[in-house]
Amino acid sequence: MGQSSDEANAPVAGQFALPLSATFGLGDRVRKKSGAAWQGQVVGWYCTKLTPEGYAVESESHPGSVQIYPVAALERVA
C-alpha cells in the first residue's frame, strides 16, 4: 500500500536472481520426495535463515497452485 503500480513492479537490481549454485532452474520439473504428492515446474525460489535454498513449485495437476519447499524435499523429474 502507498506505492504506485510502477514502484511495486519495478525490479531491484541483484535481489531476484537465482543463486549461482542453484540445484534447480526456473522451468525445471520436480516432485516432492516423500509425504503428500506434489509435482510441477519451478516458478521461483526463496531463502530464509532456516532455508538457504528453497523453491516455489507450480502444480502440474492444479495449474495456478504453488507450494514452497526446501531443496532437500525435492527431486528432479525426467
UniProtKB/Swiss-Prot annotation:
Gene3D superfamilies: 2.30.30.60. InterPro entries: Dhfr_type_II (IPR009159), Elect_transpt_acc-like_dom_sf (IPR008990), MscS_beta-dom_sf (IPR023408). Substrate binds at I68. The keyword NADP applies. Keywords: Antibiotic resistance, Methotrexate resistance, NADP, One-carbon metabolism, Oxidoreductase, Plasmid, Trimethoprim resistance. Its EC number is 1.5.1.3. Pathway: Cofactor biosynthesis; tetrahydrofolate biosynthesis; 5,6,7,8-tetrahydrofolate from 7,8-dihydrofolate: step 1/1. GO terms for biological process: one-carbon metabolic process; response to antibiotic; response to methotrexate; response to xenobiotic stimulus; tetrahydrofolate biosynthetic process. This is Dihydrofolate reductase type 2. The active site is situated at the inner surface of a pore formed by the four subunits. GO terms for molecular function: dihydrofolate reductase activity. It comes from the Bacteria.
